[in-house]
């Protein structure tokens, strides 16, 4: 392992369960199965439902909350083990076993839905008689509404059963294929290769990009088959369930209306000239500093492997795809520093005297810095971060067989979370850690609620994570001067461009995939064509003519049979988080309590209602445009920097 990332931890799961063979895990399985059997009996108790439905419902919800929390925790434990070693057949078999056991839970959900619908006229009395369940009003109404898009119980149970060897199996195949890709020439894993996109060395970025494309192309047939079959199954099931389009189902799952989505997408589309201007500027800055392989005479390797100038560099002003994550090139060698971005060993209120590092971070530095900044927002958030780090909640080591990217997963029965990342020492890795810990903090805020009230939609799930990222970015940018400040502003624009422009391309891609999949089978060449079109429509002349046509093979969200359009929630989260951060800057420390209350509400109301409670009208394009406008000053600063270079 590189010296810069020595000491990167693996997580400790022992406080959750000792092992799959441990008595605590076996006892939990027994408790889970007996709890499921008890719920079956309650669902069959027609006499109790008829005599006193309100009492029956109160008892059922209490019992269901306990069983549901345990079920999710068992599944989370199985997935955390599997995701760090996808080659382990025991882990895979255990995950499959739990998925099979979960079928009983899904079947119970269908029966409960029917019972609730038949007795919906009693719900007003229920909320009055049992005020402790008054906050369930929106949740129960959504269950009834979802029942309008459902097949028969027998058909739904069959669909769930078939998914284990259908959609879920195709999804695992994708994970296994991608997580085990390796460059035979260097021995580097796929995750290590993708992380080289952040290298300051242009030749490293270019070579990594070519290797990534080559590896993905070598596995295009099985990966395309996985995506084709997952989306095909979704199309068939949506048709049977009465959904007009997968997007309608996604909006329902997101507790969000079409008017809100139209306003969000419209605002992003209106901002595309701004983001293309940024990307063109980045391309010019890299070319001017000789920090790209795509300028004449650079001796760069072309896609064919020959040395020379990239053929599509001639006459183009856009940034090259493999340069999008390149650090801003330094105009000269600096001594000393202009701001501090590393925390001291205590992690709190240290004097900073080191420059901002775009790479070379140790995990300890990241830990101390994040903890300190979270304390700057509130003691509760700081205490939470300290607990997560001190108790090894994070698996950050890059290794073969481990899934790429990053995620946060919750264990409701234990009231804790775990975070997976692939830490290589870049500043982007630091913000990724903050992002995932933001998710975990969200769970921390709702941990005391009933299990039935903690299921927030995808849109609001991204708000807490991006808010946590903003705490880091705003702090660093605010304390920096000179080139350090410019470097961080560019990184902020880079990340936000991904959340808005790249997310828009993913939205376009998935929408077109569903439209074409309804007409017939799709192959790897079809997916490449649709991805190139989506990137052209979103990035346009912000990029050179190069496109990453295999991006569909990289993003795991496309391969979830139950989760379509997991793209616009990121844009929602970013812009909503910017609005919240603006309130924080206005209100100061008193905002922390309001923020906690907002996070607690996310599983109890629609997106529109949660946002109204926070003082926002998200059904207007103006709201989203205001968030995007906050980036104007950063781009202007970079344009001024370019002018200063021209004068030098």
Model-derived features with residue positions:
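A well-structured
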Residues: 1-299, 303-348, 641-647
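A glycine-rich phosphate-binding loop feature that marks nucleotide/adenosyl-phosphate handling sites
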Residues: 236, 282-294, 314-329, 346-351, ...
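Active-site recognition of the HExxH zinc-binding catalytic motif
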Residues: 242, 425-443, 465
């Amino acid at each position: 392992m590189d010296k810069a990332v020595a000491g990167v931890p693996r997580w400790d799961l022992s406080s959750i369960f000792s092992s799959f063979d441990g008595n605590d895990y076996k006892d939990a399985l027994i408790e889970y199965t007996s709890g499921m059997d008890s719920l079956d009996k309650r669902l069959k108790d027609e006499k109790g439902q008829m005599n006193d439905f309100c009492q029956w419902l109160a008892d059922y919800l209490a019992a269901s909350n306990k069983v549901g929390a345990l079920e999710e925790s068992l599944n989370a434990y199985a997935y955390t083990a599997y995701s760090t070693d996808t080659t382990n057949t025991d882990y895979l078999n255990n995950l499959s076993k739990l998925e099979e056991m979960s079928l009983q839970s899904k079947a119970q959900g269908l029966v409960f839905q029917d019972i609730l619908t038949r007795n919906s006229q009693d719900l007003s009395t229920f909320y009055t008689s049992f005020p402790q369940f008054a906050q369930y009003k929106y949740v129960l109404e959504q269950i009834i509404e979802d029942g309008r898009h459902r097949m028969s119980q027998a058909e739904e149970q069959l669909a769930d059963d078939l998914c284990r060897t259908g959609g879920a199996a195709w999804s695992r195949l994708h994970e296994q294929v991608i997580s085990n890709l390796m460059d035979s020439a260097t021995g580097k894993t796929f995750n290590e290769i993708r992380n080289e996109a952040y290298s300051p060395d242009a030749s490293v970025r270019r070579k990594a990009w070519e290797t990534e494309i080559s590896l993905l192309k070598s596995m295009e047939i099985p990966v395309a088959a996985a995506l084709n079959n997952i989306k095909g199954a979704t199309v068939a099931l949506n048709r049977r369930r009465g959904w007009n389009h997968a997007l309608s189902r996604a909006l329902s799952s997101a507790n969000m209306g079409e008017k809100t989505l139209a306003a969000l997408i419209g605002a992003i589309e209106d901002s595309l000239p701004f983001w293309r201007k940024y990307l063109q500027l980045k391309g010019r800055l890299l070319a001017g500093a000789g920090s790209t392989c795509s300028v004449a005479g650079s001796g760069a390797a072309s896609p064919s492997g020959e040395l020379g100038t990239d053929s599509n560099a001639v006459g183009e002003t856009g940034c090259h795809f493999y340069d999008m994550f390149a650090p801003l090139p330094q105009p000269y060698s600096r001594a000393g520093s202009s701001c501090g971005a590393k925390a001291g060993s205590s992690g709190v209120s240290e004097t900073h005297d080191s420059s901002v590092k775009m790479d070379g971070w140790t995990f300890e530095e990241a830990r101390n810095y994040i903890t300190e900044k979270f304390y700057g927002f509130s003691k509760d958030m700081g205490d939470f971060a300290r607990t997560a780090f001190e108790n090894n909640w994070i698996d950050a080591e890059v290794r073969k067989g481990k899934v790429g990217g990053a995620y946060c997963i919750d264990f409701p029965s234990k009231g804790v979370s775990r975070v997976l990342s692939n830490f290589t020492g870049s500043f982007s890795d630091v913000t990724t850690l903050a992002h995932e810990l933001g998710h975990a903090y969200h769970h921390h805020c709702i941990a005391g609620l009933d299990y039935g009230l903690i299921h927030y939609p995808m849109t609001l799930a991204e708000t807490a994570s991006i808010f946590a990222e903003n705490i880091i970015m705003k702090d660093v940018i605010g304390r920096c001067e000179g080139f350090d400040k410019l470097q961080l502003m560019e990184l902020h624009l880079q990340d936000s461009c991904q959340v808005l422009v790249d997310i828009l391309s993913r939205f376009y891609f998935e929408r077109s995939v569903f439209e074409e999949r309804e007409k017939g089978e799709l192959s790897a060449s079809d997916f490449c064509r649709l991805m190139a079109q989506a990137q052209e429509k979103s990035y346009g002349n912000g990029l050179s003519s190069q496109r990453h046509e295999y991006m569909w093979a990289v993003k795991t969200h496309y391969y979830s049979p139950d989760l379509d359009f997991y793209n616009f929630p990121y844009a929602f989260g970013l812009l909503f988080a910017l609005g919240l951060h603006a309130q924080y800057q206005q209100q100061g420390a008193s905002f922390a309590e309001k923020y906690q209350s907002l996070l607690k509400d996310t599983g109890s109301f629609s997106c529109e209602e949660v946002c109204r409670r926070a003082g926002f009208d998200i059904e207007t394009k103006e709201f989203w445009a205001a968030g995007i406008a906050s980036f104007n000053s950063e781009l202007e600063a970079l344009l001024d920097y370019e002018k200063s270079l021209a004068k030098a």
